[in-house]
Amino acid sequence: MHQPLTADLNPADEVVAVYDRTGNPIGRAPRSVVYSGGLWHASAGVLVRTGDGSRIYVHRRTDTKAVFGGYHDCLAGGVVDPGETPQETAIREVGEELGIFGTADQPLQLTEIARISWDGEWNNSPLRCHLFAFELRYDGPMAHQPSEIAEGWWWTPKELGAHLQDPSWPFVPDSRALLADYCWS
């Protein structure tokens, strides 16, 4: 497979890592090309739970998001940038979206909880993504990124599980697939 071209990029179009079907990084391309061409890429997200694990942070994406706008999610995350690992992406995204940052003395302690390759669809186009989920136990403050998150709240695993059982509930489908086998207790 050839490496996607990066010439003549629109400077406003974010460049993301492109992967092959088996999960190996093979190049880079503008996000718009990845989405319009159904190219494989990778995404990483963080499931934030209270320190005791009794609550999970759930949020609603802003209506202006390019993909799954207005849908609910329990992962703060995004696409993997060229040269970035999924864990680095997860750390970057939980900082950007929820204002949760580690320090040199106390880096964020993420635990990988799931990974899948999702060959889905959005707006009648293929959407192919290698998905990585990490868990973070956290009891501190949060600050939503206004362009990404409209609102958020803490739910028990039972509350979230009940909502996920309802296929009509507008929940990000790739996160739903990624966490299908996750133990919510």
Swiss-Prot record:
Q: Which Pfam families match?
A: NUDIX
| Residues annotated as domain Nudix hydrolase | 39-177
* Binding-site list for Mg(2+): 93, 97
Which keywords belong to this entry? Hydrolase, Magnesium, Metal-binding
Motif Nudix box, per the record, lies over 77-99
**EC number from the UniProt entry:** 3.6.-.-
Name its co-factor(s): Mg(2+)
Please tell me whether the keyword Hydrolase is annotated for this protein.
yes
Q: Looking at the keywords, is Magnesium present?
A: yes
Q: Which GO terms describe its molecular function?
A: hydrolase activity, acting on acid anhydrides; metal ion binding
Q: Which domain of life is it from?
A: Bacteria
Q: What is this protein called?
A: Uncharacterized Nudix hydrolase orf19
Source organism of the structure: Rhodococcus erythropolis
Mind giving the lineage of the organism this protein is from?
Bacteria, Bacillati, Actinomycetota, Actinomycetes, Mycobacteriales
